[in-house]
Each structure stands twice: as structure tokens, then as C-alpha cells.
Regions:
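Acidic, divalent-metal-binding catalytic cores of TOPRIM
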Residues: 1-242
Length: 242
């Protein structure tokens, strides 16, 4: 894979073969995810930076957020790639082989092990695995995403993984968005409390996210200093060489 590189203003361009011509690495990566080959991963090959996210709702949201924050994704040649919450590590490995910068944001999933009274820190461990840090042991007692906030686990993990461009939701996109932009969203959805707004958005996610974004478009810039915007700003800095 040969890539034409240039600085942020498009000058001082040069060509390089990523990973010294990493056909073996790319081949191995594609073999692992051959069942989901599509135009989306192909798009990432020609990007200056890639933002890996969960699904369609995140694609809609981050396109809208970037526009509200005056971040021109096309000019910066940044791609938003949905991995459907499954293949973050595989995508990351391919992008690393191509020497294409990336960041990611994933849900803080908690899952119960089948047939056992144990709970897996699925979201946390997904992140820790990607950055090469020892994963959490399963919990012997029932836990929730909110428990990882109150007991400090989310903060501790985030401080480590954010350095590598890996970001963990406090819960998920819908919950985090309502918590960061509560007043605007409650008014837009005509809901009385955050929980009812969250539950509404978690059903028919992409459809309702699209409708919501139209209603809160003028308020999205208020997310500029929150956790939702951090991975986007992180990738922009990398692409600009800052």
C-alpha cells in the first residue's frame, strides 16, 4: 500500500509504502474480517485519519457535531467508520499496518456470562485489550455501567486509554448525549426527565437520532468542552500534526 502524504496545508508531499509494503499484515487483517468486507473499510485506506465508532447513530451524530464545531472532515480527509461494535481491534490492526492514524469510541458495555453468576467488563476490556493493558477480571457480583462511574473504574481506565486515542463512553451515545445536553434534548423531545429521553433514543436509534439532531442543531456547539467531543479533537490534532 503506497500513500501520498503531505502536511496539513497539502505541501511537502511525499510517497511512502506503509509498514515497508505491508501486504502480509494487510492480508492477515482482511482474512480476519473477510466476512464484512465493504466500501467502508476501503474508504479508510485513503484517509488522513479514521474515527472508529459503534454504528449508524454515531455516524450521524459525529458528522453533525463536527460541523457544529467547525471541523471540516472532508478538508482534513477524516473518515468516520462504523464497526458495529465488533471489530474494533481488527480495524485498528489494519490501520496501524497502513500507518493511518485512528481514534475510537466504544460503549461501556457490561455483559453477564452465560450460565454463570459473573459479569464481564466488556467495554472496558475491549479498550484495554486494544492498548495492550491487562484486562479486568470478571465480577462475581452484578455490575452496571453506572457502577464503573461511581467506583472510579471508568475514570481510571479512561486516563490510561485516552493517551492512545481510545475513548470509552460513560454508558453509550444516547445516555452520554442526554447527560451532556440535557435541557436542549428534553425540550426537543418533550420529555420530563433524562431517563425517559434516553429510553426513547435507545429505540429506533438511527431514525430518532437523525430527528433529534435536526432539532438540537443550534445547541450542538455546547458540547465543545465535553467528553463526547474529545476523540474528535484528538484525531484532528493528530491529522494537523499538532
Amino acid at each position: 500500500m503506497v500513500t501520498l502524504w503531505g502536511n496539513y496545508e497539502g505541501i511537502s508531499q511525499h510517497t511512502v509504502a506503509a509498514s515497508e509494503g505491508c501486504s502480509k499484515g494487510i492480508s492477515d487483517g482482511w482474512e480476519d474480517m473477510s466476512y464484512r468486507m465493504s466500501i467502508l473499510p476501503a474508504e479508510s485506506f485513503f484517509s488522513n485519519g479514521v474515527f472508529l465508532i459503534e454504528g449508524p447513530s454515531e455516524i450521524l451524530f459525529y458528522h453533525s457535531l463536527a460541523k457544529s464545531l467547525n471541523i471540516d472532515l472532508d478538508y482534513l480527509n477524516i473518515s468516520l467508520i462504523s464497526v458495529d461494535g465488533i471489530s474494533f481491534k481488527i480495524y485498528a490492526a489494519i490501520l496501524d499496518a497502513l500507518e493511518i492514524p485512528w481514534v475510537m469510541r466504544t460503549d461501556n458495555d457490561i455483559s453477564k456470562l452465560k450460565g454463570q453468576e459473573k459479569w464481564n467488563f466488556a467495554g472496558i476490556n475491549r479498550c484495554l485489550d486494544i492498548v495492550g493493558i491487562k484486562k479486568f477480571e470478571h465480577s462475581d457480583k452484578k455490575i452496571t455501567s453506572l457502577d464503573t462511574l461511581t467506583n472510579g473504574d471508568w475514570q481510571t481506565v479512561s486516563e490510561e486509554i485516552n493517551k492512545s486515542g481510545v475513548y470509552l463512553s460513560k454508558v453509550d451515545l444516547e445516555t452520554d448525549l442526554v447527560e451532556e445536553l440535557s435541557a436542549s434534548i428534553l425540550d426537543a423531545l418533550d420529555k420530563k426527565d433524562n431517563q425517559s429521553a434516553i429510553e426513547y433514543l435507545q429505540k429506533k436509534k438511527a431514525i430518532r437520532m437523525r430527528i433529534l439532531l435536526k432539532k438540537i442543531k443550534k445547541d450542538l456547539h455546547n458540547l465543545n468542552s465535553g467528553d463526547l467531543a474529545k476523540p474528535l479533537y484528538h484525531l484532528v490534532k493528530i491529522v494537523k500534526g499538532e
